[in-house]
Amino acid sequence: MEYFPAALEKLVEQFARLPGIGGKSAQRLAFHVLSLTDAEAQEFADAIVEAKKKVTCCPISRNLTDGGLCPICASPKRDERVICVVADARDVAALERSREYTGRYHVLHGVISPMNHVGPDDLEIKSLVERVAAGGIDEVIMATNPDTEGEATAMYLARLLRPFSVKVTRLAYGIPVGGHLEFADDATLMRALEGRREI
């Protein structure tokens, strides 16, 4: 991109590093940023820096929070006897949109993926086992994506939790194989939660 100033090229390159953003989208975003007022651009930059500094993991669910417990773990209205295990925080948002699930969550921050050199020790599995071992949990719902890695992760966790007296279920397949929770509509997620099965 020799025809763009170096600072603009750098901005385009940074946007292009984001998942799902190709070269043309990165250019569009960069040009939009240039059209912002100085105050708007500063507000945008400050929001990125603030989110990076303040957003951490909930000490219980490993969901995202800006300090202390996440709102779901802090809510007395949630059923603490049921844990829904998801790959990442976007899946929490997707399931919450269904308004069907009233339990708590556990965010793994990924799935077991030998191809990507991600093993069980790279995920929030130990903290899940510790939660279940502490007692008071009746059911663990495996809500990882219905693709090869999601299935392998769910099966691994089911075996790991077998020694505990806890029911382990898997979301029903209203979600297509190879699909991702964050893209599922509310009705599909509701059916998947209602039709979960023991594994």
Descriptions of predicted regions:
Residues 2-8, 17, 30-92:
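Cys/His-rich Zn2+-binding cysteine-cluster or related metal-binding knuckle/ribbon modules and their
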Residues 3, 36, 40, 116-120, ...:
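Catalytic cores of large soluble enzymes that bind and process phosphate-bearing ligands
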Residues 10, 129-141, 145-199:
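Long C-terminal interaction/binding lobes of large macromolecular proteins
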